[in-house]
Structure formats: C-alpha cells, structure tokens
C-alpha cells in the first residue's frame, strides 16, 4: 500500500474472510469474498459519495477482484488491478492436485465440490473469474510472473483474452507467484500508475 499512499491514494487493506483477524469458518477462494468486497465498496461510498475506487488484489485477492468484475459495480469503481489471479477455483485446485500430488481432477475435485457445497455453501464450478471477466466493464490490468509455479501464466493469458473491457497486461520475466512487484518494482508500479492515469 505504500506506493499508493505516496501517490496520494487512501488505502484500505481488509483481511479476507476466515483469514487474519476476519471472521468466518471457510475460505471462499474469492467467490464468497467478492460479496464482502462489495460491502467494503458500499461502506466507502457511504462515507464519501465522490470516491474513486481502485480494486487491487494478489493471488486469491486477485481472484476476488476478478470475480467481482462481472457483477454490477458502482460507477465509483474506476479500475481493477489483478496480480497472479487464477481462472477459477476448479482450475486452480485441478492444477495443484496434478502438480503437487499427481492426482487427477476426477474424483478428487468432485469430492471436494460436495464438501464445499455442504460446508461453505458455494459451488466451486460456479466460482469462475474467467466467466466473470467476460461481463466486466471496468478497465482491468492483468499482471503475472512467467515463472509462477502456483498459478500458471496461461491462466493470465486466458483471463486477458476473455476480458471485453478496456485492458492491459504486464508479464514479468522470471517472477514467481506474486513476486513481480519485488522482481521489478519500478516496472511494476510504473505500469500500474500509467494504466490508472489513462482512465482518470
């Protein structure tokens, strides 16, 4: 948040549900969190109706802002910046099951889907950033490291291609998962503020 506050932005960094000091029993992988995010947006607007809001998230936070992008957002939301977001909950779990444990998506994910439906009350097949960005109207900046071994770079490419809104993309060479801002901080933040200056 420091780079944003230095540019004069007010910064809000909430814990996502069931993480840090936030309440909740189940991590929503972005799908449940997008509704929490909209509550934060509404709270900001209630305090200042003229607020211009930028949504910025990394990893699961990136999935959250992408999943929110396809919902009806207030006109105060001016841009979305996502760093290392995944296409869907199903896709990231399938990718990890294969990469980490050499397990097939079926029947592992199908069993997980039943548990998620029962316990957390959401369908992991429905929880798709890819489907949401197709409906997005707010400009989106997609950022990814080409050495990400958790969320593969191809997911960023698919998300970028699916988005019909104003968009841009930054791929940082040799950066792992959410490492882009540390690998090339000047490039990273210059791109963000250049992107934001174009949409004000």
Annotate the PLM regions.
Residues 1-23:
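Conserved alpha/beta-hydrolase
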Residues 135-137, 142-144, 148:
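Short beta-strand/loop motif that positions the catalytic acidic residue
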Residues 47-59:
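Alpha/beta-hydrolase fold nucleophile elbow
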Residues 160-178, 185:
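Catalytic histidine neighborhood in serine/cysteine hydrolases
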Residues 27-48:
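Alpha/beta-hydrolase active-site loop
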Residues 183-200:
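Catalytic active-site module of serine/aspartate enzymes centered on a nucleophile-bearing elbow/loop
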Residues 67-123:
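Hydrolase active-site cap/lid region
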Residues 129, 138, 152-161:
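Short alpha-helix in the alpha/beta-hydrolase fold that links the catalytic acid
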């Amino acid at each position: 948040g420091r780079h944003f506050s230095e540019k004069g932005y007010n910064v809000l960094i909430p814990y996502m549900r069931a993480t840090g000091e936030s309440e909740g029993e189940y991590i929503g992988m972005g799908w449940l969190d997008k509704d929490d995010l909209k509550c934060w947006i509404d709270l900001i607007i209630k305090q200042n109706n003229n607020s211009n809001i930028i949504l910025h998230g990394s990893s699961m936070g990136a999935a959250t802002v992408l999943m929110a992008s396809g919902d009806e957002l207030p006109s105060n939301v001016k841009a979305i910046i996502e760093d290392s977001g995944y296409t869907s909950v199903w896709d990231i779990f399938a990718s990890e099951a294969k990469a980490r444990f050499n397990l097939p998506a079926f029947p592992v994910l199908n069993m997980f889907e039943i548990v998620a439906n029962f316990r957390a009350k959401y369908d992991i097949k429905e929880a798709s950033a890819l489907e949401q960005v197709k409906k997005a109207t707010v400009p989106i900046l997609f950022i990814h490291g080409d050495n990400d071994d958790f969320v593969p770079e191809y997911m960023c490419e698919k998300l970028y291609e699916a988005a019909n809104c104003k968009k841009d993309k930054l791929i940082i060479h040799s950066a792992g998962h959410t490492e882009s801002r540390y690998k090339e901080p000047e490039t990273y933040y210059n791109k963000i503020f250049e992107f934001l200056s174009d949409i004000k």
